[in-house]
């Protein structure tokens, strides 16, 4: 644990609600007690979050953690918390300083017991470990599942021909027929329970050598009937993604299991829009 004077120095100029997490004897970072969000912190944020929080760290990675209440205590869901612990290789000498930013967003700083702050990806952390699956010769008859996204992704996709990247399959036959421009990058998106943002998988990014705009810059969803909706470029768990996806799913009555073809449009080599093609059920 950090010395008291170090804690006071770090908190000296902090006016927003905050709290610390560090290990006590007999605890590990995956102990249930480590998943508790202090009730005092919840009260001071005045209901800014209820169902989930988003942890953001210095190197612009973010983790979405869903919440559940047991009796009078608010817990982060075990799967989400454990992912955050594993991704950051938290150990007995680590201390978390968690500060409310806005609404559900919490800023997390990681300090060692000697007071040194971790300001870059912890050694050995690989933001995304999905393997790259080369596209098979008959992509419309074969599907090769890849490892699932991190908790909260709500995304699965497969690729097409010409070496296109591929993730979990949505079993969409001949997705290229939906494309406005056959040369554009694309992937197939399956709607799942957790669909807050639209992720672009590592295989797709690598296959097309995709580039994205700055974090929080605008991305446009192009919809049938020349309709448009806007989202933002984000990075969660080291993965590029776009906000606004859950709103789009609700507005267009997409249900869990439905699939869409996401065609990426670029300007100057940078992804600027996602053309959304609703897949007709055969």
Swiss-Prot record:
| Gene3D superfamilies listed in its UniProt record | DNA-binding pseudobarrel domain
Lineage, top-rank taxon, reads Eukaryota
Read off the SUPFAM superfamilies from this record: DNA-binding pseudobarrel domain (SSF101936)
Q: Which SMART domains match?
A: B3
| DNA-binding region per Swiss-Prot/TrEMBL record | 20-114
Q: PANTHER family this protein is in?
A: B3 DOMAIN-CONTAINING (PTHR31920), TF-B3 DOMAIN-CONTAINING PROTEIN (PTHR31920:SF125)
The name this protein carries in UniProt is B3 domain-containing protein At5g25475
> Which species?
Arabidopsis thaliana (Mouse-ear cress)
The beginning of the lineage is:
Eukaryota, Viridiplantae, Streptophyta, Embryophyta, Tracheophyta
């Amino acid at each position: 644990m950090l010395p008291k004077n170090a804690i006071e120095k770090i908190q000296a100029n902090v006016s927003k609600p905050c709290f610390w997490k560090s290990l006590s004897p007999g605890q590990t970072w995956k102990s249930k007690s480590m998943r508790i969000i202090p009730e005092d912190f919840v009260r001071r944020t005045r209901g800014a979050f209820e169902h989930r929080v988003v942890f953001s760290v210095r190197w612009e990675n973010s983790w979405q953690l869903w919440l559940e209440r047991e009796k009078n205590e608010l817990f982060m869901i075990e799967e989400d918390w454990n992912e955050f612990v594993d991704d950051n290789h938290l150990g007995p000498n680590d201390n978390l300083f968690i500060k409310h930013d806005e609404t559900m967003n919490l800023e997390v700083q990681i300090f060692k017991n000697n007071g040194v702050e971790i300001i870059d990806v912890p050694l050995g952390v690989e933001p995304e470990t999905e393997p790259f699956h080369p596209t098979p010769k008959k992509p419309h008859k074969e599907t090769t599942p890849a490892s699932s996204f991190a908790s909260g992704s709500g995304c699965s996709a497969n690729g097409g021909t010409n070496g296109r990247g591929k993730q979990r399959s949505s079993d969409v036959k001949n997705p290229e027929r939906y494309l406005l421009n056959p040369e554009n990058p694309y992937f197939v998106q399956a709607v799942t329970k957790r669909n807050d943002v639209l992720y672009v998988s590592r295989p797709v990014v690598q296959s097309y050598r995709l580039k994205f705009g700055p974090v929080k810059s605008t991305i446009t969803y192009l919809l049938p009937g020349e309709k448009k909706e806007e989202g933002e470029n984000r990075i969660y768990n080291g993965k590029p993604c776009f906000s606004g996806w859950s709103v789009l799913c609700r507005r267009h009555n997409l249900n869990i299991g439905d699939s869409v073809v996401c065609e990426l449009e670029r300007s100057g080599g940078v992804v600027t829009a996602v053309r959304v093609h609703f897949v007709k059920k055969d």
